[in-house]
Amino acid sequence: MDEFVTAEDLVHEYSVLQEPDSVVNWSRYIAAKRDDPCSVSWVYERCLQALPAQWEVWREYLQFRMRLLDGVCAVQHAAEFEKVNRLFWRCVEHNAAVVEAWRLFLGHAQRQGALALVRQVVDAALRGVGLAKHRTVWEDVVAYIEELLPAEETDLGEEQDLHELVRGALFGGAGAEDAGADIWSSAMLRRYIQVAEDAEAVLALLQRTHDYATVVAVYEKHVLPVTRAKHKGRQSYESQFRYLVALDHTGATAKLEDAVARCAQLFPERAPSLTIFLAKHYVKQGNYNRCTDVLTDSLKHTAKSSEFASLYDFLVVFEESLIEVVLEHLQEHPENEERWGADLERHTDQLDGLLADHALLLNDLKLRQEPDNVKHWLDRVELFDKAASKASVYADAIASINYKSQTVPGQLGTLWWQYAQLYIDDGQYETAKTILDKALNVPYNFLQDPELIWTKWAEEELKRAGLDAAMQVLSHALQIPDDHELLRDKFESHEKMPAQTVIFSSLKLWSFYIDLLEASSESDEHLERTKAAYEATIQLKIATPLLFVNYAHYLQDKGNHVESFSIYERAVDIFPAETAFEIWDIYIGEALKYGLPKEQIRDLFESSLKMANEGVECKPFFLLYAKFERDNGMIETAANILHRACRAAQTMDAKRSLWTLCLNWCRQELGGSYARALYEECIQALPNHVAVVYVLEYAKVEEGLKQVKRARALLQYGARLLHPANNADLWEYWELFELRHGNKDTYKDMLQLKRKVEELLEGDGLPVPNQIGNIAFVASTDGLQNPGGESTNINNDELELDM
């Protein structure tokens, strides 16, 4: 005692001797000795003998002793650590209910890596503290275990190299060995899961111990029953897959198969990867046939392209890997060829078949996705070479397809026809006709389907038996029922009427039928039958403009020109103006060629020109009409027609070309005086940038008529329409005009006007409004004649321009 007590300590000695239960006195004594570790420990020991249940003092003392071991190797200085261990045991003997004491002890034991001590401390702590504190103790243990265990494999074994897996299963030694199981950690976790709130989290940690037998046992005891009891069935995929991995490692094939099936039901999007996982398990077990069977069966049932691709690719790689591994082995051990020869040949055949059947397997997938898609069935037919196989596909298609779900016109009819064509090509025409009969009883959604079948059947009869047989087939199809309008209305209003009920309205069949009739004999009977067929299409309101034209031409070929023109008359009344335009073009051309009376032709032209009121550009008819009148010597009438054409033109290009033609025609045929009123109207009707061309042209006409003042007034007007920079032709002509007819004053006035126009239009560059209607031209010495031939009054007022 003397070695620890100094003269300065006597006061503290007296105080602790007088009051040994005073924590304050002991704390002061300890504080006075803080610079000497041995003395501090001596005082703490005396204090704790006096106050053995004082946890605060124990905590200070234990933390003080543990700080002394900071940075010290627990192995080299095991004795020192053991001293602290004994202190902890003394502490918890008197403070068993203090959970903080146990946690501090656990931390010290974990620092030493003493697993046996950790387990002893945990056992004692769980006995000492209350049940409510057990989870707190376990949290420290679990945290320690997490530090001990390796990180979890993110792929949980899904990405094992298949080549090495096959090699290891076949010949051993090549596959990677499982890491050793951490039995201590798995045992601790197995105890902890009984009180843990999140069993799946504990299972994830248990997986990292590689003690797969324990993983299986824990999952089946603590996770699976809870899931079933709550009727959830949806614990995380990762949790279930850890169970599968554990079953795989323990070789529990039967359990694994059941678990994979259950997991695939809960997580259907994971079905392909689960199938591949199970296939790998069979590879490890050496059960290659079962591996192939599972993959092949999955290929036949999957309905997703991505799943199909992953399964197919894995199966191909498996077969390739197995063949490659066996070949490598035989290169090193040729004496084993007899042992592996049969297996090698079988798997080579399986690989060849798998590659050869890829298109067929892919088609199977498409048909599972869209069993009513006719195109997929037609594609499937092309995958077979033998007629019997093709016929089987057609039969399967017909039995499988839902006719009501069809959305592509003509596809279903194509399927039926190709089915019949198969027997036709094989010389079994009667069987083919039986198939066609059945095909025509199918409730198609679209007219194109029965239409195709009737057309193909008639074409086949035409090749085999001639025109009459083909016409007989078509006439049967085209029988018009009395209530044809009602049937068509119901079909077109989508009242679930099969297309076969309105086959009589097929323009394609009628056109084919008419072609056959026209190709038949020249008898009057056939003439009437042909006309009746044409009339039927008109009655059914399915006749096209081309059909009307063909009808008219047919009658012309038979010498019935007048009757053919009546067909044109009916056609132009039926179709809208845009369509009737083409018919009128043909009609008028043929009427002119045939030489109808002039008045009748004029009536045709006038009727055709009514289309202009409906917005149709009738320029060709106006020109043809004008030419007709000119050829008949009606010059002014032709001019009037061209004038009407200018007014009726729909586009600017048409207006310009027609005004140019009209004005040139009038000048040449009727003289410049006649053209004056037309020029004035033309300039009014066209925008400034176009009208200025005609103003200049008009001025030249007036100059030619010696009307200098009128020509100058026109030039003055035209000069104001555009900026001089955009009106160079007019200004150039005007300058020469003044040199020919003017004087100094008129030339000066011209230049003055040019400056004013430049100033006026320089700002925005826009032309002035066209005001030709407000201009009174200088009087002409000639009387004016309008296009209608009537004399116009002379305007005696000169033009005054506001300069």
Swiss-Prot record:
Location relative to the cell: Nucleus
Transmembrane segments: none
Coiled coil (UniProt feature): none
Claim: Repeat is one of the keywords in the record: yes
Repeat (HAT) residue spans along the chain: 3-34, 35-67, 79-111, 113-147, 393-425, 427-463, 482-519, 525-557, 559-593, 596-631, 633-668, 670-704, 708-740
GO cellular component term, pick one: Prp19 complex
Keywords annotated in UniProt: mRNA processing, mRNA splicing, Nucleus, Repeat, Spliceosome
GO biological process: generation of catalytic spliceosome for first transesterification step; mRNA splicing, via spliceosome
SMART domains per record: HAT
Family matches, as InterPro entries: HAT (IPR003107), HAT_Syf1-like_N (IPR055433), HAT_Syf1_central (IPR056350), HAT_Syf1_CNRKL1_C (IPR055430), Syf1-like (IPR045075), TPR-like_helical_dom_sf (IPR011990)
Domain of life where this protein originates: Eukaryota
Transport is among the record's keywords: no
Classification via PANTHER family: PRE-MRNA SPLICING FACTOR (PTHR11246), PRE-MRNA-SPLICING FACTOR SYF1 (PTHR11246:SF5)
Function: Involved in pre-mRNA splicing and cell cycle progression.
Family: Belongs to the crooked-neck family.
Assembly description: Associated with the spliceosome.
Protein name from the UniProt record: Pre-mRNA-splicing factor SYF1
Source organism of the structure: Eremothecium gossypii (strain ATCC 10895 / CBS 109.51 / FGSC 9923 / NRRL Y-1056) (Yeast)
The encoding gene: SYF1
